[in-house]
Amino acid sequence: MENRFQNDTLFSEWFGQSLSDVRFPDNVTVYSQADSAVSFENVRQPIKLVRAAMGSGKTTALIHFLKQVPKELSVLLISCRKTFAAEILHRFTLNGLEDFELYCDITERQINNRKVIVQIESLHRLTENYDVLILDEIMSIIKQFYSKTMTKTKEVDCKFLSLIKNSSHVIAMDATLTRHVVEFFAAFKPDTQIALIRNTFVSAMFSNRVAYFCDTFFGKEFSFFARLEDKLRWDKKLCLFCSTVLAAEYMHDLIRSRFSLKKVLLLTSKQGKCSSIESWIRYDVVIYTSVVTVGLSFEPVYFSSLFVYIQLAKGGPDMVSIFQSIGRVRRVIDEDIYIYMNPVLIKSYDPLAPIAMPPCSDWSVAEQSIISESCIDFRGKCSGAHKYNFCSVLKCLFRYRHYIEKTTITSLSDSLFLLCSLLCENSIKVDIVGNGFPMRKEVFLSFLQILVEECHFIEKKITLPGDNMTFQEIISSRETIMNGDFYENGNQLLHKDYITDMGKFRATFLSPGVDIFIASDIVSDLKNESKRYVFVNVWLQKCVSAGVESTRIERVFNERIKSYVLPKSFLCDEYFVLGDISGVYEWGMLIDLAFLAEMIRKDLKLKSCTDTTTDISEDDLLLCAARRSSDILQIMQLVFTVHVQFFQRYSLQTLQLFNKLRGMRIVTGVFSIEKFSISILRLFFKCAFNMTLSASKPRYIPGKAYRNLTKNDLENMLDNWEISRTNLKTCKELRKALTEASRARRKQTIYKLQGSDISLSVSEVGVFGQHASPGVCVSS
């Protein structure tokens, strides 16, 4: 499973393209189907593994197979999503398979129905094994083991393996099924014959398509938006996929501003889950995000073209998810897809390393060697993830694919390469500004450079507060009255439970000096997932700093924080979970991060990991990086999926190649150990605590900002420096004299953290049982 891979085969190994070059175990028989849709005819092996592209008839073949299954046999179909499960049930019902039940329609907690469709997260509810097991979109099923919604990983993993072990027939299908899936089944059931069906047939509705990659969004005749405008002027119906909510809202507003009479539908997570797409035929333009994915397919011949806006961003959807969302529209009249990748959020000169070499024919041996070394470093760090995946066999076996998917998001060249590979494997032709794929190195690098130079930043919408009153204003106002369970002030309502919730939160998680109004502001911020993540990291680091044993921290974290609920608004009609955090789903990762953060805090002589008042000397930064660089790089990869190589790998030639693959201009000069040290610590603080490590000048008084210096402070500083302050009477005159004296002294550069110092408000004490008073009491 863990054979060494090189940069030229990394994607093909983990996304299925290399199946034709592999020697499989003796219990595996390979079937090739090239000229027709997927078929199980004359395939007698009890385990059938199918790799076939979208539109190759996988579901049709499955339905035909199930119609031939004897009535007395039990059948279980496992899906990756609830919407997919519902769509499969609908397809089954339309084709006469009416005895299947959907897991979410079964009211009993335990499921023992004979024929059932279940989402992977609910697998632990099953009490029986099944004769026939169907794993549709198996790679997406495995991917769900890394999702934060997978709360019972160990139970689901054990049940999944038990089902495979005890089923007499298994069908597993996916467009990117890999050799590792084949090897897993062959090793897990060595005495069972396995059929690997490699189907390369693709229906015309996909094989005739061409994906045009645009290098600019605005500005020229063949830019992304110019093509979109041209289509709309010809009254063509368009479907537009956007990888982020921000991009979708931006495109929605832009189209509405230019084409006010067009009917535009916007589908994002803000509008809720998308369970049906039948209404799309009522609109001129449909804009959707990854809420529309596997399981939802638009079949009517309605849309002329498909447009794809990919905003590359850490934490955004990976290229496989984007590829699956692109395929939701099954028929495109003009058979064209226009794709624009916006790298503005990943533009950086930080030493992030790519993990794959795009398949250009003219890379030099030295360039190939550089990426190969990066690939080896990447593999070495990913291998360390096994200690976090002890509760899941699936997570351990397929961790490389998970890290590849997540790491490529922050690499422009890797993202483009992987998406092009997925399109080509589905027989969709790729056109990059008039060039096919693969292409010459200079053309590929030039395309990346134009993307970066011409990319645009999307401003977030700012919602003005309007007439809304704050928590403090409502309960402090003399005009506020009690109306049932609510405090009422005009049209402003505040449920009495909100006060109780804020008092409880304050007593449990915050320092004694934090009042209930600040607690309310903090809770409002915590509605943002990234803010919750920082809050949890700060709390854990403070626990470690206080000397609390890790076993006790883990127990309290699981019992209190993971399930702690907070109101989304004053009305207390909706709640969110404090432990609903992004990125990290393993306790071991969280606690390792906390211990590393505490060691870094001590090295840098900080009060906390969000301390904004302490000056950090360059010597302390360099010493910290020298001590901790290996641990930092490991955590950066395993927790934050950011790939940075060890310093020894970064020659001038390496940096130049990496900058080219990021679309950045070549920077001359030596990449020093000082620059490397500052870069990795800057990345660490940004990822873990959303703090920015910036170069600055030393503070005149440690712990006190320049703007907060009093007249007495200024006079004492000038006296200590033996600077005459004769005729200097005002603060303005004193400040000017101090600034000029400071320049003359040519002080060394120091560093400081900038951002929100949430550590000042967070306490590790309350959650362990020491409770403060609940806070303010409001009379009715």
UniProtKB/Swiss-Prot annotation:
Keywords: ATP-binding, DNA replication, DNA-binding, Nucleotide-binding
Residues in Helicase ATP-binding domain copies: 39-195
Cited InterPro entries: AAA+_ATPase, Helicase_ATP-bd, P-loop_NTPase, Replication_origin-bd
Keyword Protease: no
Residues binding ATP, per UniProt: A52, A53, M54, G55, S56, G57, K58, T59
Domain of life: Viruses
Manganese recorded as keyword: no
Gene Ontology molecular function: ATP binding; ATP hydrolysis activity; DNA replication origin binding
Single GO biological process annotation from the record: DNA replication
Coiled-coil portions: none
Recorded family membership: Belongs to the herpesviridae OriBP family.
Function: Probably involved in DNA replication. Binds the origin of replication (ori).
Protein name, per record: Replication origin-binding protein
Species of the source: Human herpesvirus 6B (strain Z29) (HHV-6 variant B)
Designated gene of the protein: U73
